[in-house]
């Protein structure tokens, strides 16, 4: 029988002192916790260190993908669980992870179902649940891509095995902070697309925006999530509008990017 694989929990963070304690406590059972701080101005570093994390700093921001790559490079154990400060590993998910570590398939990647919080409600529809993300994998085999935002784990043709148990994701606790983050993501998405030679027309802005609302509200049953479902459909449409309008503006030199 093979011995248990060891686990490094890895995260990138900036100004997350308020969220880090519950996050780190939910993974305190791991063999190692790595936090790569990108220049916090609050007590994030001290909080992480006080809870047993190994903290490193890198302020030359080149996007989420490369920051995750660097964070993983500090991990010294067999498996990596990549998480964010606004996520929590539930006891059920921990049990699933422990089962993998006791009987691993190193060629596989394991996905977690995220339960996303939006304005006081953990969403069950709207495309926000189960919201599976590939987060548990063999350290020596897989890395994140270079994308500035919405980065993904490069898994090739690896088998993806779903884990049981949810990961809680406190996505939208503060509406204004959430809006600011969405605007930043839209800007980075448009910048990356523009650099890759992508362009869009005026009509494309409108069709993608309308499509985002219909997809969230109707096709993904957002109406079953009540008021929050309707608000999320509008927010998704707004985010999509910002992405494509920014790409349109960049293509016509209406931006300094």
UniProtKB/Swiss-Prot annotation:
GO molecular function annotation: glycosyltransferase activity
Highest taxon of source: Bacteria
Cross-referenced Gene3D superfamilies: Spore Coat Polysaccharide Biosynthesis Protein SpsA, Chain A (3.90.550.10)
InterPro entries in UniProt: Glyco_trans_2-like, Nucleotide-diphossugar_trans
Biological processes per GO annotation: lipopolysaccharide core region biosynthetic process
Pathway, per record: Bacterial outer membrane biogenesis; LPS core biosynthesis
UniProt entry keywords in alphabetical sequence: Glycosyltransferase, Lipopolysaccharide biosynthesis, Transferase
This enzyme's EC code(s): 2.4.-.-
Family the UniProt entry places it in: Belongs to the glycosyltransferase 2 family. WaaE/KdtX subfamily.
Name of the protein in its database record: Lipopolysaccharide core biosynthesis glycosyltransferase KdtX
Organism lineage: Bacteria, Pseudomonadati, Pseudomonadota, Gammaproteobacteria, Enterobacterales
Name of the gene encoding the protein in the UniProt record: kdtX
